[in-house]
Structures are given as C-alpha cells and as structure tokens.
Amino acid sequence: MVRLGDELPVSRTGPLRSLDPDQACNQVTGKTKIGTCGFGVAQAEYARTFSCVEVQHTFYQPPRLTTLERWRTEMPADFEFTLKAWQLITHDAKSPTYRRLKRNLSETEKAEAGSFRATAIVNEAWGATLAAAKVLKAKTILFQCPSSFKQTAENIARMEKFFCSIDRQDLNLCWEPRGDWNAEVVRSICVSLELCHVVDPFIGETVTPDRYYFRLHGRSGWRYQYELGELKELATSLVKSKRGYVFFNNSKMTEDALKFCKLLDEA
C-alpha cells in the first residue's frame, strides 16, 4: 500500500562503503527529508549525500552524551538527527532487544519497564532520551512499539498518561505501532496526543498525512531491495507541500535512498 491520504551507529550492511561522488541527496526534496536508519557509509560521506539520519543506538542503549556531542559537531549545522526513544519506554524486559542493553536491571525494574508504564525506570528512560535529543539538536523522536503492545484499554490509558505527563519541549513525537491496531483507534490516539503516525508505506497507510514519517523495512524482509517501479509509486504519492521523513531500513538502504531522492526530484 502506498498512499498519503487524499491530499554513529554501525550499519547492518557490513563494512562501510564509499559513495559515488556524483550521487548526492543532501538537499531537502520539497519538504521531504530522506535518509537511512543508521549510517551505511562513513559519516563525513553521508553528510555530503543526505540531510538527515535516524539514530538507532538510542533505542538499544543511549550512548554517552560526550559521544553524541561528537556526532553533532562532526556533522553540518543544518544536518538533522532523528532518534528512537529508549526501549525501556516501549518494550517489556522480555523483548530480545534487551540483549543489547548495557545495564543490569533488578527484578523490580524488569517488571516496571516498557509499555509506557508510569514507573521510575520509564521516567528515567524518557529523561535519557530527552537528553540525547537535546545534545543532537534533534526535533523528532520516534517511539517504536513491538507487536506485543496490543490495542487494549490498559495500553491506551498508559500511552495517554505518559504523553500527557512528559516534558515534550515542542518536539515532534512520532509513534510506530505494530501488530493489529485499528486505523480509527490509531487516528484518535494521534490526534488527541499530538503524535505523528509512523508506517512502512508499502504495508499500511498513515493516519497523519500532513506530517508523515515513513520507515521502509523491505517488503519481504531486511534483505529486500526495492524495485524502481515501487520507488516511483511512492515518490508520486508524496505531496511536496507537506512535511515528512522517508527513512530506508533495508540491506540496500543507501542505494535505495539515493534512487528515491532522484525519483522524488523528478516527480
């Protein structure tokens, strides 16, 4: 499905590669910013090619603030970081992603982590996420939920309490629900809590088309490479007057992002 309504991290692709100097996507295409989830090439090369990146490390274990400061100073002033909120906010401790957590949790902390619970460890995780965003001068934070975070009255109530109580600091907060969530329920949550709905546009349709955030994970998995026709379909569906992000998160993310930049320019 590709519709938009009617209107430094280590790459998973293996060793860092060099980009063709004739390839560049460092301009903002209309109001759409294009990049990858993590760096697939050396950071200096990436900055000459793209205008933004989605930071993955903050989800697993936020780096030291001094490390984030270095990332910020090494990139151009107008380069944009978006980042994923720490998993302690969204994912229960039984999630396999906790294998990359670099701290030992007590049994109490394990029971109180994740699912937007009103607990000390979730509040601490939000504070760490907010601190990372401040250092990176990030304007957008993504809350990615696992498919185990079901559409229940309890989970919705937890979300409402969390987002109504935190210090948002005028940040653009984005939510990526996974699993079987009803579109009208998602729309209601996003409107009432002022959230941007995050989707893979080849799988679902965003309920917040005026400010979209697309994450392309590969139609049949991470190793998938998008065909030119698929990227053209997405490019023509975007309304350039609207603001949004398109991040590639597949094995060929850098190449696909570059192809998409060119197609969007031509659309």
Feature locations, PLM:
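Residues lining hydrophobic/aromatic ligand-binding pockets adjacent to catalytic sites
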Residues: 2-5, 11, 16-267
